[in-house]
């Protein structure tokens, strides 16, 4: 986005992105193992109309969603499921969207929202790439033709 190759839609344009709040879940792989913390937030910050609300536990000190420890394939026998606890932390921010950059975390957070029931309301979990893609301005000059079955356009 900084180089101008990706352009966001005008937030005042009806096709643009409406103002919304989101919180970002740092995946263990990106944040703790690779130190990728600021970059996803920079991408989200470049999306018009986005207000980022941090969870108490974030960055290198973030709280695992449970996928990294293989908990997505296990049932907890005691206590609260890890993804339910992380989802609760995200909901506590009051954000409308929980963003993440890890497909496994996304599954865990979506399951956590489903389990949260009414408390989750209309909160959704989305990948950073989905949020960015939805904000991009259409560039008709760059669109590829649609091919129809039988070779026609």
Language-model features, listed with the residues they occupy:
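Iron-sulfur cluster-binding electron-transfer modules in prokaryotic oxidoreductases
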Residues: 1-153
């Amino acid at each position: 986005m900084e180089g101008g190759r990706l352009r966001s839609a005008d937030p005042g344009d009806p096709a643009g992105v409406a103002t919304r709040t989101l919180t970002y879940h740092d995946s263990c792989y990106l944040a703790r193992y690779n130190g990728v913390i600021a970059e996803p937030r920079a991408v989200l910050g470049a999306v018009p109309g986005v207000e980022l609300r941090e969870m108490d536990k974030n960055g290198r000190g973030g709280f695992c969603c449970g996928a990294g420890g293989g908990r997505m394939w296990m049932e907890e026998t005691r206590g609260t499921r890890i993804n339910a606890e992380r989802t609760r932390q995200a909901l506590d921010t009051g954000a409308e969207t929980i963003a993440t950059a890890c497909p496994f975390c996304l599954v865990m957070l979506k399951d956590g929202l489903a389990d949260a029931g009414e408390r989750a309301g209309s909160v959704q979990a989305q990948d950073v790439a989905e949020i960015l893609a939805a904000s991009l301005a259409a560039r008709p000059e760059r669109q590829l033709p649609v091919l129809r079955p039988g070779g026609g356009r």
